Amino acid sequence: MKISLSQFKRFEKQIILKKIGLAGQRRIFSANVLIVGLGGLGCPLLTYLTSSGVGRIGIIDYDKVEISNLNRQTLFYPKDVGKFKVYQAKKIINKINKKIKIIPFKKKITS
């Protein structure tokens, strides 16, 4: 996979790390991750994975955004209250990095 100049500029601080380099950044671009739950940990995890360039991220959650979520689920805004987390998260994340493929699953996970 060839890294474009704009991608190089965006991810340069990761690429210059000896443990990552160009080869490592290419692996990040082609990585697949699944996040189960968009709560207090899932939201920042999604943001950081997106910002680092992970290429494909699945997100699973069944809940809607509630007003009580906003203090710890920093991905969401008051205007998102009442909407399903997975669909709002996809819209927000696509604004951060349009090259990331977000796959929302509105599913309830049970044991």
PLM regions and their residue ranges:
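Adenine nucleotide-associated cytosolic modules
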Residues: M1-S111
